[in-house]
Amino acid sequence: MNLDALQQRLGYRFSKPELLQQALTHRSHSAQHNERLEFLGDSVLNCAVADMLFGMFGKLDEGDLSRVRANLVKQQALYEIAQMLQLSEVLRLGEGELKSGGFRRPSILADALEAIVGAVFLDAGFEAARTLIRKLYIPILEQVDPRTLGKDAKTLLQEYLQGHKIALPQYNVIATHGAAHSQQFEVECMVPKLEVRVFGTGASRRAAEQAAAKLALDEVQKLVPQLLKRSRAERTGKTRKQPVPPDPQLSLRLKE
């Protein structure tokens, strides 16, 4: 297995290439697989990401830091990084796993990425692993808003409305469709002050509410700036000095 291209993409060259090979080996392939390295890499990754967030976002509290970290190290995030590194091309899978498309499976790719982090840690220590993690994550962090990352649509809508002193939205189930085992819920979300009324659907009430909240948030974010602009214009008009009307009696005296 030629791993030069992968090491180039990682920006790290192993002094013990067998560690990288083991990190890419699924348990379906051989007894010398990557699960122990994955365990180690998971801990190293969490520590390095926590350290990075602590240094980058000095104004975030403990709860927000935990939320952001959880979203950066969850399976989907790791899977996307693994895809960027093209790990599916170099995974070592057993024949059955290979035939079933294991090289595309998010869990397998995410685990392999954690195992690579563990392998780098064993190969050269924590600083080398932290350098790799920073290289992988800094481009991601430059594109996300840590204040909203990981928050669902209902939470974002509620926080946005509260920030502008607007009453919270109202959610109502207006219809359900389908058999009991495959129901679809339809929910309306209303923000009366802004005359917003949208509808969302989902396989559960919660999912439908989230879908409706996302649509409502899009509408609210368009309307609130217009409302604020109009409010400022009205305040400016009221405070602008009005011309003093002429005194009719003074006009008569001047004519005399």
UniProtKB/Swiss-Prot annotation:
Cited SUPFAM superfamilies: dsRNA-binding domain-like (SSF54768), RNase III domain-like (SSF69065)
Gene Ontology MF terms: double-stranded RNA binding; metal ion binding; ribonuclease III activity; rRNA binding
Subcellular location field: Cytoplasm
Q: What is this protein called?
A: Ribonuclease 3
Per the record, the domain of life is Bacteria
Oligomer status and interactors = Homodimer.
Q: Where does this protein come from, organism-wise?
A: Cupriavidus pinatubonensis (strain JMP 134 / LMG 1197)
Which reactions appear under catalytic activity for this entry?
A: Endonucleolytic cleavage to 5'-phosphomonoester
